[in-house]
Amino acid sequence: MEQFKTYALMTGLTLLFIWFGGMIAGQTGMVIAFLVAAGMNFYAYYYSDQQVLSHYHAEPVDRAHASGLYQIVEKLTRRAGLPMPALYIIPEQQPNAFATGRNYEHAAVAVTEGLLDLMTDEEIEAVIAHELSHIKHYDMLIGTVAATIAGAIAMLANFGMFFGSGDRDRPNIFVMLALMFIMPMAASIIQMTVSRNREFMADEGSARMTGHPEWLQSALTKLDNYARSITLPEADPQTAHMFIINPFSGKDVSLKQLFSTHPSTEARIERLEALK
């Protein structure tokens, strides 16, 4: 069922992109948008995981090099009924983590050195359980495709005035200009809403997997505080939604709540409290 929801969302966002192309440049725009969307979805599906791991200089590790982490992940994957994901460590001091990959068999979990150095074993277990919940519900693919299509719509809007069409039913210039401003914002809101809802679901999944909601509450509190004082130099806004805590938490951003990739830490802790 979760895989069906994933592909349904991918299809819906792709159709939105194609429709936007048609509104800007008629049938020609629809064809171009379809080809661009197909190419971007193909790339996102097969290669986005390696791209993001490379961007953060993540190094693969095994049981011999990270036995404690490996044992935690191994225990939780058995409990969740998941295959063992590939494990990576990011050489950064901000405590954080993310999951990536297109399905159960091609999943990876990456944690920073800061997470391993500054968190307790219980907090690390809660964070790993959160990331495994993302894997279980195909959230990595959903987030990747949502970000890809949102970026594509913004790109199409930026170049919208250069598309031409001979179709007589093309909307007037005022409608087209309005769409060029509205559609990228709408796509971003869809992306952020999807991301926030999935964070709540993964938090709940972590609490149920470990049986200790308080472990994740403690982890989220510390992660949020550290994110405000320790930067993640390689952090990219396009991948911020992947992390358990927004790596930009310490920065002031206009319209922060509307366009935040994560619900507030306070809201997440409050929801976890209800699970006790």
Curated annotation (Swiss-Prot):
Pfam families: Peptidase_M48. It is found in: Cell inner membrane. The keyword rRNA-binding does not apply. The active site is at E131. Binds 1 zinc ion per subunit. Zn(2+) binds at H130, H134, E199. Keywords: Cell inner membrane, Cell membrane, Hydrolase, Membrane, Metal-binding, Metalloprotease, Protease, Transmembrane, Transmembrane helix, Zinc. The chain crosses the membrane at residues 16-36, 142-162, 173-193. GO terms for molecular function: metalloendopeptidase activity; zinc ion binding. Its cofactor is Zn(2+). HAMAP family: Pept_M48_protease_HtpX. Belongs to the peptidase M48B family. This is Protease HtpX homolog. It comes from Sulfurovum sp. (strain NBC37-1). The gene is htpX.
